[in-house]
């Protein structure tokens, strides 16, 4: 009998996944799986004692998926992974084409086919959707879970407005696939997926092409910067938004800037190396 490890984060999204978890578990049992399930204990590696399962199903947001993938890579495992969207934004699940309803997504997994997709890595940390730093990029870290549960994605917007008070330029030296350039940026977004917080910022990105889509918002006055990003969201090509694609990136800055991976707090860097690992998941 095949075995599935079903991991869910009861704090993700509006906390509804705990109610759905019983129905999802029963669906896999009916499909002939032996199931090990339960809420994720973030103080330990969930793969301890479960290194040989046939399938890992993760129900949560991008941060939960990030945690599970990093713990899996920590043990050098290459297990079949299924994603059930249960967070606030669920950007990576969206890139995979998953149903938004968790129970429907579980049915989709049971009837689906195996595919290999890309995974990003920055220094020693993996990310499935986005690595970022600068204005607005740490908003999700500072948005209270209670507010996210109450009003969903709108909570990110409210928290993001507060960042206008602390906006600053970040001097960057960048080497992208061997091409060097310098600029002062307000924000840097390195996409494996195509959305951030549900916003389609890199619509031409693909999780199967072995490439990052990179967006850098160059420093100008704040109003012009906001207008430029809005134009980009609407499909325009403002000169202030530098958009390029690369397999590897070396970025150096004199500022030890806080960073974000898949909506979670990451280490601050003055030098980082990011590379796309094609078909790594």
Where are these regions (language model features)?
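ATP/NTP phosphate-donor binding region
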Residues: 1-59, 66, 70-71, 104
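Catalytic core of DAGKc-family lipid kinases
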Residues: 5-7, 31-39, 74-189
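Short glycine-/acidic-enriched loop or helix-start segments at secondary-structure transitions
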Residues: 17, 67-70, 93-94, 199-200, ...
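Hydrophobic packing residues within well-ordered alpha-helices of enzyme cores
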Residues: 24, 68, 92-93, 139, ...
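Catalytic phosphate-donor-binding core of small-molecule kinases
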Residues: 35, 160-169, 208-256
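Short acidic/glycine-rich loop or secondary-structure boundary segments that cap or lie
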Residues: 137-139, 182-184, 196-199, 223-225
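Glycine-rich phosphate/pyrophosphate-binding beta-alpha loops
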Residues: 189-201
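Conserved small/polar residues in nucleotide/adenosyl-binding loops
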Residues: 270-277
């Amino acid at each position: 009998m095949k075995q599935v490890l079903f991991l869910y984060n009861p704090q993700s999204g509006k906390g509804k996944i705990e109610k759905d978890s019983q129905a999802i578990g029963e669906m896999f049992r009916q499909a002939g799986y032996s199931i090990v399930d339960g809420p994720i204990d973030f103080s330990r590696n969930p793969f301890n004692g479960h290194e040989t399962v046939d399938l890992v199903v993760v129900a949560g947001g991008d941060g939960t998926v990030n945690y599970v993938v990093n713990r899996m890579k920590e043990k050098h495992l290459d297990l079949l992974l299924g994603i059930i969207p249960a967070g606030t934004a669920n950007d990576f699940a969206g890139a995979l084409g998953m149903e938004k309803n968790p129970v429907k997504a579980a049915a989709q997994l049971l009837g689906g086919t195996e595919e290999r997709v890309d995974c990003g890595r920055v220094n020693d940390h993996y990310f499935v959707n986005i690595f970022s730093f600068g204005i607005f990029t740490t908003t999700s870290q500072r948005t209270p879970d209670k507010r996210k549960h109450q009003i969903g994605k709108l909570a990110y917007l409210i928290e993001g407005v507060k960042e206008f008070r602390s906006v600053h330029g970040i001097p960057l030296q960048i080497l992208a696939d061997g091409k060097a350039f310098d600029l002062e940026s307000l924000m840097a977004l390195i996409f494996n997926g195509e959305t951030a917080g549900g916003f389609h910022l890199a619509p031409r990105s693909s999780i199967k092409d072995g490439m990052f889509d990179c967006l850098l918002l160059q420093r100008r006055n704040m109003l012009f910067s906001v207008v430029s990003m809005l134009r980009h969201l609407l499909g325009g090509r403002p000169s202030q938004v530098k958009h390029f694609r690369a397999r590897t990136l070396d970025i150096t800055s004199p500022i030890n800037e806080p960073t974000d991976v898949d909506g979670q707090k990451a280490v601050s860097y003055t030098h980082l190396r990011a590379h796309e690992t094609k078909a790594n998941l």
